[in-house]
């Protein structure tokens, strides 16, 4: 990539999470010359550690955030349309218990508003009596149950959604580079004019020039921000755990109220697993070191066990636990759940456009707003990109992986028994989805690391053998990459 040295782009995007990749896609589709650099892998931070929900945000109604709910519902329907292979409708059951903070009247009113905002955009919600609720979800505690409601949102593969945006940006002419970190901004007369970037594994640092720069690094502290307003951001830690779904027994998604602190939480179906989350606590941890604590795990187990008395989950049931940091526009409040999930966009004195906050669901509209600002800063007439009607790539993914399996039978063997991932998934991840490391493949192009108790460590050597010829790894490099994966697993999935 050193051939980029000295090149001048219209836009430099720093950060390959969902926001950065969405911005790069939108800008490239408008005809701008775009370069995006991500220091690790696409979605390796917050974007790949979400609840994997594309949702209207029904819980935001309680705080009166009607604009955010309306935008989220609109964007949910947009994503269902442009990425049906990645975004799927999902039914949620919300049980109601006697004396609960959210009772029948409050939930009914909320769902009515939710439905009115989504008119013509989703299936209608409906209510249940106690017997119907238990019939729908027999795993639930029946004592004190007075009824329930069913409403519809959507789920996704957060990492693959991010990668799809990166691929779309590249397909529209953007230069999209992962595992290459921006180490310093270039400035002339106080204005940012480019950056010095350095590949993660090999190669010398080089310069990239740009007329506009978007900092989409979220909570990463990188020294790029010079404006005090843009520094007013805080990190909220969100922890999820996964357990065997048969231990819980949920048929669909469940929306619950934690008896510990009254927060809305979810129990979500994920194939043979159930994902339970999430926490919401202020943290000073860095995104590179954030992890689930014993207290986080115990909170989620205690909250879940209040609803699933037959399960009585313990720490031994936890297959995986992981944490991400939500970048929130800072507020002087004790409870991070009270902070709006709406985004903020601030242009600092050097001309860098900094974005903080936002939701996975609303990334596309947020990117559109950011690129509008970029075009104004470049004195360009606003051009509308058809990001809301152009399908994201990847619809042929399953077909292409099946073709690889037919062409090479050795690639059809499951990497782990009872899981769908094969060597063909790894080959496809490298050839098509820009994967470069074992973590890229086992954590994000597949979810094998989330779905095995050893987080894929037992197949790391085999995975390295499969992709080594594609990535040009020598024997020594293969060993280095396996050790790198072991460190990544400990950092991401360790509980302390």
Protein language model annotation of sequence segments:
Residues 52-136:
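Dinucleotide-binding Rossmann-like beta1-alpha1 core, especially the glycine-rich loop
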Residues 14, 208-218:
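Short hydrophobic core segments
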Residues 5-19:
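Beta1/beta-strand and adjacent pyrophosphate-binding region of the FAD-binding site
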Residues 28-49:
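Glycine-rich FAD pyrophosphate-binding loop
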Residues 3, 8, 40, 86, ...:
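C-terminal accessory subdomains/tails of enzymes that are appended
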Residues 215-228:
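Flavin (primarily FAD) binding-site architecture
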Residues 7-9, 202-212:
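Core beta-strand elements of the Rossmann-like FAD/NAD(P) dinucleotide-binding domain
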Residues 178-193:
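A conserved short coil-to-beta-strand element within the FAD-binding core of flavoproteins
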């Amino acid at each position: 990539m050193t051939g980029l040295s000295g090149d001048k782009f219209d836009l430099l995007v720093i950060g390959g999470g969902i926001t950065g990749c969405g911005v790069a896609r939108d800008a490239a589709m408008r005809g701008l010359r775009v370069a995006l650099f991500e220091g690790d892998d696409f979605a390796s931070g917050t974007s790949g550690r979400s609840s994997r929900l594309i949702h209207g945000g029904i819980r935001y109604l309680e705080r009166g955030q009607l604009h955010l709910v309306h935008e989220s519902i609109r964007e949910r329907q947009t994503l269902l349309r442009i990425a049906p292979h990645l975004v799927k409708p999902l039914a949620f059951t919300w049980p109601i218990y006697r004396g609960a903070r959210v009772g029948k009247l409050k939930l009914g009113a909320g769902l009515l508003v939710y439905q009115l905002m989504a008119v013509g955009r989703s299936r209608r919600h409906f209510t249940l009596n106690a017997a119907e609720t238990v019939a729908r979800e027999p795993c639930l505690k029946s004592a004190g149950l007075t009824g329930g409601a069913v409403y519809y949102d959507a789920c996704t593969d957060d990492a693959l959604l991010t990668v799809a945006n990166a691929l779309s940006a590249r397909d529209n002419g953007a230069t999209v580079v992962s595992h290459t970190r921006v180490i310093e901004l270039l400035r002339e007369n106080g204005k940012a004019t480019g950056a010095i970037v350095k590949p993660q594994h090999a190669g010398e640092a080089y310069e990239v020039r740009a007329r506009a720069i978007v900092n989409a690094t979220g909570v990463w502290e990188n020294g790029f921000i010079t404006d005090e307003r843009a520094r007013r951001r805080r990190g909220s830690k969100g922890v999820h755990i996964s357990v065997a779904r048969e231990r819980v027994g949920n048929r669909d998604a469940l929306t619950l109220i934690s008896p510990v602190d009254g927060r809305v939480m979810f129990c979500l179906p994920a194939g043979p697993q159930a994902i339970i989350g999430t926490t919401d606590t202020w943290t000073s941890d860095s995104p590179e070191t954030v992890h689930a604590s014993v207290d986080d795990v115990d909170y989620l187990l205690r909250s879940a066990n209040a609803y699933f008395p037959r399960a009585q989950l313990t720490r031994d049931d936890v297959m995986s636990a992981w944490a991400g940091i939500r970048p929130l526009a800072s507020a002087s409040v004790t409870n991070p759940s009270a902070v709006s999930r709406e985004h903020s966009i601030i242009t600092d004195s050097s001309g860098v456009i900094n974005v903080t906050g936002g939701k996975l669901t609303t990334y596309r509209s947020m990117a559109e707003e950011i690129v509008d600002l970029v075009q104004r800063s470049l004195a360009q007439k606003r051009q509308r990109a058809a990001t809301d009607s152009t399908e994201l790539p990847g619809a042929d993914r399953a077909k292409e992986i099946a073709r690889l399996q037919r062409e090479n039978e050795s690639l059809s063997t499951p990497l782990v028994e009872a899981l769908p991932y094969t060597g063909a998934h790894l080959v496809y991840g490298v050839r098509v989805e820009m994967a470069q490391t074992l973590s890229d493949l086992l954590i994000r192009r597949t979810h094998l690391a989330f779905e095995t108790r050893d987080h894929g460590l037992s197949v790391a050597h085999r995975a390295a053998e499969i992709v080594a010829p594609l990535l040009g790894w020598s024997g020594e490099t293969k060993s280095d990459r396996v050790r790198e994966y072991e460190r990544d697993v400990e950092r991401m999935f360790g509980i302390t």
